[in-house]
Amino acid sequence: MKKIVLATGNQGKVREMADLLSDFGFEVLAQSEFNVSEVAETGTTFIENAIIKARHAAQETGLPAIADDSGLEVDFLKGAPGIYSARYAGEKASDQENLEKLLAAMEGVPEAERTARFHCVLVLMRHENDPTPIVCHGKWEGRILTEAHGENGFGYDPIFFVPEDNCASAELEPARKKQLSHRGKALKSLFAQLSAQTAQ
């Protein structure tokens, strides 16, 4: 099994990505196992931030690194919280605080104007100076609920309505979420690209 470092300190992402990546024969090691320091996400886009994180993890560990930068884009809020999704309510905000701030911002907004999507960018760097990192996108369309539902998932999952299953993301079984999610779609794209490269 190939080892790969996951460049995130978010335990929810570590669990989800380890599960997804194991399907493709990768052993996922969290960067915390190597005492990799958090790096400042100074980019202005998901791609820039993912590259910053992947390069830093590869540099510190000497292993290939995969980084995901993702967030929730709410149309009524002109794409916010976007790259600031994890710190929407402040630098050290909890998932609950971010969720409550978003619900407050969307209070009174009619259902038709509550459209949103999760957007994930995944970057795989084979080494710190990889000149051609693999970059993949995944999007998951839905809308913002008026209150939280469900116990599964993390982040904004309890208020993200999934039209395909008529429930909140946090009410989905993990296997179903894997099929639908932005992260699952980005990973499928990543492995399609990896397979194409190894076949050449």
From Swiss-Prot:
Keyword Magnesium assigned: yes
One GO CC term, this protein: cytosol
Cofactor, how bound (note): Binds 1 Mg(2+) ion per subunit.
Binding site for substrate: 8-13, 70, 154-157, 177, 182-183
The keyword Heme belongs to this UniProt entry's keyword annotation: no
Stored InterPro entries: dITP/XTP_pyrophosphatase, ITPase-like_fam, RdgB/HAM1
Binding site for Mg(2+): 69
GO MF terms held by the record: dITP diphosphatase activity; ITP diphosphatase activity; metal ion binding; nucleotide binding; ribonucleoside triphosphate phosphatase activity; XTP diphosphatase activity
Cofactor dependence: Mg(2+)
Catalysed reactions listed for this entry: XTP + H2O = XMP + diphosphate + H(+); dITP + H2O = dIMP + diphosphate + H(+); ITP + H2O = IMP + diphosphate + H(+)
Swiss-Prot/TrEMBL keywords: Hydrolase, Magnesium, Metal-binding, Nucleotide metabolism, Nucleotide-binding
Biological process terms in GO annotation: nucleotide metabolic process; purine nucleoside triphosphate catabolic process
Enzyme class label: hydrolase
Top-level taxon of the source organism: Bacteria
Record-annotated active site: 69 (proton acceptor)
Description of how the protein assembles with itself and partners: Homodimer.
Protein family according to the UniProt entry: Belongs to the HAM1 NTPase family.
Cited function: Pyrophosphatase that catalyzes the hydrolysis of nucleoside triphosphates to their monophosphate derivatives, with a high preference for the non-canonical purine nucleotides XTP (xanthosine triphosphate), dITP (deoxyinosine triphosphate) and ITP. Seems to function as a house-cleaning enzyme that removes non-canonical purine nucleotides from the nucleotide pool, thus preventing their incorporation into DNA/RNA and avoiding chromosomal lesions.
Name this polypeptide is given: dITP/XTP pyrophosphatase
